[in-house]
Amino acid sequence: MTDRVIIFDTTLRDGEQALKASLTVKEKLQIALALERLGVDVMEVGFPVSSQGDFESVQTIARHIKNARVAALSRAVDKDIDAAYQALKVAEAFRIHTFIASSALHVEAKLKRSFDDVVGMAVAAVKRARNYTDDVEFSCEDAGRTGIDNICRIVEAAINAGATTVNIPDTVGFCLPNEYGNIIAQVRNRVPNIDKAVISVHCHNDLGMATANSLTAVQNGARQIECTINGIGERAGNTSLEEVVMAMKVRQDFMGVDTRINTQEIHRVSQMVSQLCNMPIQPNKAIVGSNAFAHSSGIHQDGMLKNKNTYEIMSPETIGLKKEKLNLTARSGRAAVKGHMADMGYNEQDYDLDKLYDAFLKLADKKGQVFDYDLEALAFIDMQQGDEDRLVLDKLSAHSTKEYPATAFVQLKLDGEKLSTSSIGGNGPVDAVYNAILNLTGLEIKMSHYNLTAKGEGAEALGQVDIVVEHKGRKFHGVGLATDIVESSALALVHAINAIYRAHKVADIKSHKHH
């Protein structure tokens, strides 16, 4: 019988820490529900003690997830463990994940304790967590740089205290595959009570080894992999869920293990996370990159036409990537749009069909032909825009020449009332439009990030603008999508301002018209 590897997804905890701006609770829940459909065994969704916002998002997700175990992180500190329990207790099934650093560097420099003290703290933390649940995971942070004797000692103590999963993280992505596999093998062979717990691994990609290290660990006895969608995470990222899952599936002959992941959901979840997290996927990214199933070489194309197995070790359909259909136009009905979304694996509850169809018709009038990837972008950008936007972009025009400064005319609607202004100056039309919008709203905003990506191909491709702005010491994310770059830039700023209104309850900007 094939062994099963537990997939522990930490996109919403370790992955989210790497984002330029935090996700909203609604966006986190959307991702959590997608992860549930993907079939992850455990999803780690936050660090409840870190902020009230994190506590509430963990609690909201815990309330909604029925077919996966919901986990939350806590340091080996009573208040952390108590907060994790309070946030998780509404869940159908939950896990408390507690950790403490184990490497000499961390123990001496950060904790300023002896290793004996650290073992004692780990034991106390696991025991406290066991008061709340019989599913407790213990991690020795920076295990990759911890001596093997100390790893075995703290793992044995944690299991004796009641830990049911023991995680051996390569926190800084320091290990090479054989070295890391040897650590796991020694834990498996030297810890006398190891049969009472699952060995877990959590790898970072600083040297590009996260996937290789995780798979080598499985070959040496690990039965849980901690990973994120698209490999998002701090610094160079975490182990990529899609890479380890597909490696174990495609090379089951060699690995001899399986997961309960529904791989046909991979493409869909990957796209959702990329859009909502404002983290573009590199084109040559394994499994989910836009080039992953593209064959540009003439020899490859010839081979593919004769027999696709010549250069393709897995089919795009395995990850839920369907062949592109081209025939969506302004004459296409709602059923056609719904059908295309269904072909890509999206259920009706994933998006608002009315809003998507309205947005589709506007785009189809401009582009003529709309592709599946356009629909996908429209569905998820709309999801981010939210229902309670006070500020709406009504009209826009911008003009720029070499001889004269750029000019812009902008008309906004605030709570239904029209506001309009013109601006002259700025470094090009986008800058002029931004100056006009900021003049109208009277908000003090500093732009800290601006990114433009093409969604689709050709001159009529959609341009997606992602921005991060700073207002009163906080960062807000905005995203806009249009065939015109100036329009998508304006939509992104309006989106960010609506986020500011919701977060800070800024005074009605109509008062600024009189100043």
UniProtKB/Swiss-Prot annotation:
Keywords attached to this entry: Amino-acid biosynthesis, Branched-chain amino acid biosynthesis, Cytoplasm, Leucine biosynthesis, Manganese, Metal-binding, Transferase
Q: Which residue ranges are recorded for the region named Regulatory domain?
A: 392-515
Q: Biological process (GO) annotations? A: L-leucine biosynthetic process
Looking at the record, the residues that make up the Pyruvate carboxyltransferase domain are 5-267
Give the protein's cofactors. Mn(2+)
Where, by residue number, does Mn(2+) bind? 14, 202, 204, 238
Record bears the keyword Cytoplasm: yes
Pfam families referenced in this protein's UniProt entry, alphabetically: HCS_D2 (PF22617), HMGL-like (PF00682), LeuA_dimer (PF08502)
**Which cellular compartments is it found in?**
Cytoplasm
Q: Does the keyword Metal-binding apply?
A: yes
Please name the top-level EC class of this enzyme.
transferase
This protein's major location comes to cytoplasm
Question: Which pathway does this chain act in?
Answer: Amino-acid biosynthesis; L-leucine biosynthesis; L-leucine from 3-methyl-2-oxobutanoate: step 1/4
GO cellular component terms, alphabetically, are: cytosol
The EC number(s) this enzyme carries: 2.3.3.13
Q: Which SUPFAM superfamilies match?
A: 2-isopropylmalate synthase LeuA, allosteric (dimerisation) domain, Aldolase
Q: Name one GO molecular function term.
A: manganese ion binding
- Catalytic activity entry: 3-methyl-2-oxobutanoate + acetyl-CoA + H2O = (2S)-2-isopropylmalate + CoA + H(+)
How this chain assembles, per its entry, is: Homodimer.
The record's comment on protein family reads: Belongs to the alpha-IPM synthase/homocitrate synthase family. LeuA type 1 subfamily.
Q: Could you tell me what this protein does?
A: Catalyzes the condensation of the acetyl group of acetyl-CoA with 3-methyl-2-oxobutanoate (2-ketoisovalerate) to form 3-carboxy-3-hydroxy-4-methylpentanoate (2-isopropylmalate).
HAMAP family from the xrefs? LeuA_type1 (MF_01025)
Query: What is the name of this protein?
Result: 2-isopropylmalate synthase
